[in-house]
Amino acid sequence: MEIPPQEAPPGPGADADADAEAEEAPAEAGSSSGASPPTDGRLKAAAKRVTFPSDEDIVSGAVEPKDPWRHAQNVTVDEVISAYRQACQKLNCRQIPKLLRQLQEFTDLEQRINCLDLKGEKLDYKTCEALEEVFKRLQFKVVDLEQTNLDEDGASALFDMIEYYESATHLNISFNKHIGTRGWQAAAHMMRKTSCLQYLDARNTPLLDHSAPFVARALRIRSSLAVLHLENASLSGRPLMLLATALKMNMNLQELYLADNKLNGLQDSAQLGNLLKFNCSLQILDLRNNHVLDSGLAYICEGLKEQRKGLVTLVLWNNQLTHTGMAFLGMALPHTQSLETLNLGHNPIGNEGVRNLKNGLISNRSVLRLGLASTKLTCEGAVAVAEFIAESPRLLRLDLRENEIKTGGLMALSLALKVNHSLLRLDLDREPKKEPVKSFIETQKALLAEIQNGCKRNFVLVREREEKQQLQPSASMPEITITAPQPLEESGDLPAMGAQNGTPGPGPGPDSDSDSDSDREEQEEEEEDQSDQQRDEGGTDQSSSAPCPALLPSTDSLGPGDKSPPGSPSSPTEQRISVSSPGRGHKVFVVTRVESPPERPEPPVPPTSVSSPPPSPPSPPASPPSQTMDTQDPESSEAQPQTEPSQAGQPLPNGLKPEFALALAPEAPPGLEAKGSSCSLEHALHRSHGVSKLEELLLEASQEAPRDTL
């Protein structure tokens, strides 16, 4: 028997020898072309290479995501109905007559339609699949799926459609007891992904232990829901713990309705108390018809103390609360500043409970509505309530129905209403309570009528107060007063000083430009010239060439180069608008009539000295100027100055040819200064009686015209 030769183990230098052999191997392979691979089967290290494609070759193609609204563009009612019927035929399911009737009534398909009502219709999986043809084309504000007998498959299909097409902002899935875990999982996905969903009504739809984690996760991470109804959803225990823990981090939910869930006074109430400690965005918490008890109310009151700005409405109707729980609530009320509605109806509070609550209500100052219906109150408790009414300046409504409040309690309430001026509604039983003395029944009726009258009186006072507040201008709004136009004097003259500073009297005001006598004489001369011109023209051109109204600020608010000359003509029909604003002083605006706003105001031009006979006494104009300043249209006022060139072909009232008027100042802007000088020239020309005088005036006018038109 031959023994195979044994190889000696590699020595310390074996690794170095192996490396040397590996380096020599490529040289040997290059020398012998037909060399076989090495006997040990090892691959060469230099033969391993990795290559990557270029950037252009990495992406072979791209697919755009499907547009969910590709079917909803320019859709018609007939198209929607036809698509729905074809889907029903394809799926071999019945058509819903109620849906077809609603589709035929829809008119505006561009906007969200008010409501899609499928309440009471039995919806199986195939029927829900056919509804996709409607949801892919139309959007709704409310989708009502109440009591539609949804199963897991149908519910998950519908919720996926509503999430994908954003079909509703308000969704009602109440009274569907068989949607199961997959249905709630799809509903949670819809709540998390749909940004438009704001209202979810899941009353009488059980949310059990294995379904609650999905909903809790959706509410904790991201949800746009503002209103959540979970009445009679079997939340007691672990579902409520998961829900309350998730809502601690939710800042969007504002209304939470948890009625009829058999919530107990220990674990469940402790979770609600912790929720109120951390969540300050919740505004309405409805806990009616549960078993909170006094022990649970203690936990809730601990959370209420932290609600300085948050909870607005707390409903504790029918929770077996007694006077012991009212002591906890009375200590918590002074700490909350946001609670406005507190409903404690149908709890055996009794007179002692109202006394425990009274001091807290008086110290609270935020409660506006208080419900104490059917709380075992008698006249003694009504007296305590009356003390609170007398001390409350904000209480709006109080419910005391279904209590044994007789004559004594009604008298206390009536006296409190004489002091209170805020209570608008006090609910009491209409029928008087039985009394041993028959006359007391009539007294109760009289007291009830007196209480009603007191509430009506407060209502009238509140309305009057609101109207006064609306009429009072705010501090940031300027007060605008319009002064009536001054009556015309017999001479038809109005001082130009009053026209500029808005003062009714002829004396100089604090904002007048000049107090010198020469200015007054110039103003009187200008006014006489204007009245003479009106007499010559006979008022025939006043209506046709009436200038547009303008608001001219007072001269004290203008710059040194913007002041108009003191001799500018003033209209007797002007209106003065006085504007005062806090911190901005007092300004006066004068409503007058001008041809058009001047392009560049000029300094006052002294009137040319023209020798003319003394003017005749002014006569009143043929027709007084009509006050059309408030009724003129801006378009008509802009079109009026354009009618003046059409009058160039008519003879002028002073007997001059129209060509002379055009040659006198062809490029003159219609400013106030040019008007004043032209009026004085026309007056002088009209009063001259000789040809020589007329020639002198024409010569002077031709010399003065270029200077006036600068």
UniProtKB/Swiss-Prot annotation:
Keywords: Leucine-rich repeat, Phosphoprotein, Protein phosphatase inhibitor, Repeat. The modification Phosphoserine is found at residues 54, 60, 581. Residues 27-38, 543-565, 656-676 have a biased composition (Low complexity). Residues 637-649 have a biased composition (Polar residues). The keyword Phosphoprotein applies. GO terms for molecular function: protein phosphatase inhibitor activity. Residues 1-46, 487-677 are annotated as: Disordered. Inhibits phosphatase activity of protein phosphatase 1 (PP1) complexes. PANTHER family: LEUCINE-RICH REPEAT, ISOFORM F-RELATED, PROTEIN PHOSPHATASE 1 REGULATORY SUBUNIT 37. Interacts with PPP1CA. This is Protein phosphatase 1 regulatory subunit 37. It comes from Rattus norvegicus.
